[in-house]
Regions:
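N-terminal beta-strand motif that seeds the catalytic metal site of vicinal oxygen chelate
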Residues: 1-22, 74-76, 80, 127-139
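A general structural signal for stabilizing positions within well-ordered secondary structure
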Residues: 5, 28, 67, 109-112
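Loop/turn position at the start of each blade in beta-propeller repeats
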Residues: 9, 45, 71, 103-105
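Vicinal oxygen chelate
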Residues: 18-22, 76-117, 123-128
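Amphipathic alpha-helical segments
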Residues: 22-36, 88-91
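Short secondary-structure junctions
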Residues: 33-40, 94-100
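Short, basic, helix/turn surface patches
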Residues: 64-68, 88, 125-136
């Protein structure tokens, strides 16, 4: 396969179809700490645009409730500022969010209110510092 000079530097946004925009918005903001981008779309559709760092999460309410129809997104992976997986699991359980058993890669999965799978990866302070240094060096 031919190569290009393009360099992908991160994910801009992920779009999820949901059954209730407000419920999903509360989940992502209150449980996972996303922020509201305060954007709007035409009045014919219900949507919410959130942010996690510089990445966006766009939630669109589907009229027929079929959030997994057609082309389903397999999952979204989130790096979580935590030193280990136990810290993530403990915090999630405090708010009633159940997680899967640990995977061989030391991650867990949770589901949002519409059943979208979310992989949670611990990302320690030292790992975050290394990533920031690598990003600065690549500029």
């Amino acid at each position: 396969m031919p190569t290009t000079k393009l360099k992908v530097t991160g994910i801009n946004h992920v779009v999820l179809h949901v059954t209730d925009v407000e419920r999903s918005k509360r989940f992502y903001m209150e449980v996972l700490g996303f922020e509201d981008r305060n954007l709007s779309v035409g009045s014919s559709m219900k949507a919410s645009f959130l942010r996690c760092g510089v990445q966006g999460l766009d939630l669109f309410e589907v009229a027929n409730g079929d959030v997994h129809g057609g082309k389903e997104m397999n999952h979204m992976a989130l790096c979580v500022a935590a030193d280990d997986l136990d810290e993530i699991v403990t915090e999630l359980s405090k708010v009633g969010v159940e997680s899967s058993d640990r995977t061989p890669r030391n991650t867990v999965f949770i589901s949002d209110p519409d059943g979208h799978r979310i992989e949670m990866l611990p990302f320690s302070a030292s790992e975050r510092a290394l990533e920031r240094e690598a990003a600065r060096a690549s500029r």
